[in-house]
Amino acid sequence: FFKNNNLDYADFVGFLGDKGGMAGLALAKLCYETLMADGVKAKVALEKGALTPAVEHIIEANTLLSGIGFESSGLAAAHAIHNGLTMLPECHGMYHGEKVAFGTIVQLVLEDAPTEKLEEVLGFCIELGLPVTMKELGVAELTREQAMIVAEAACAPDDTMCNMPFEVTPEMVANAILGADALGHYYLMDE
């Protein structure tokens, strides 16, 4: 939703080359709302082997809704960060969704999102056990140089960072990565 919420659907060309629209943004928003409402309930149910309505809602959000939203309105910084993280060997063992989760936090920092929104997403990730720090992604001590490697790859001309509604530089992204990592440590209270 964050990546799509930043795109002006009147001017945006989606992943498949079509104009973005209100439907894509609405589906992305529904995806986000479903994850927030049912994500923790679904995780807990699955840990006990239970198939509950919350699990079914999350499956629908993760497949159908996110797929249609993606086709209709594309991707932005969160997925570009994922792509940049693939440049660090330490992150190779992490799942796509884990890297995108951290990328979402980076995108929120990059956008200077309200504290309440950052806290909501950080809290959600922490409750689900999703990474909120680079250490959790396998990078023991994040350096500025590593952040720049990720940032430069994320800002490649053919990546999705170009879908942000403002010009983004590798330096801005590196600072957002460092800031997101610091916030993650703060909210985990491990620094």
Regions found by a protein language model. Give the residues of each.
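C-terminal charged capping/lid subdomain of soluble metabolic enzymes
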Residues: 113-191
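Active-site segments that bind and position negatively charged phosphate/pyrophosphate groups
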Residues: 11-130
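Internal alpha/beta core interface subdomains
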Residues: 1-7
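Noncatalytic linker/hinge segments flanking ATPase motor cores
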Residues: 9-23, 38, 147, 163-165, ...
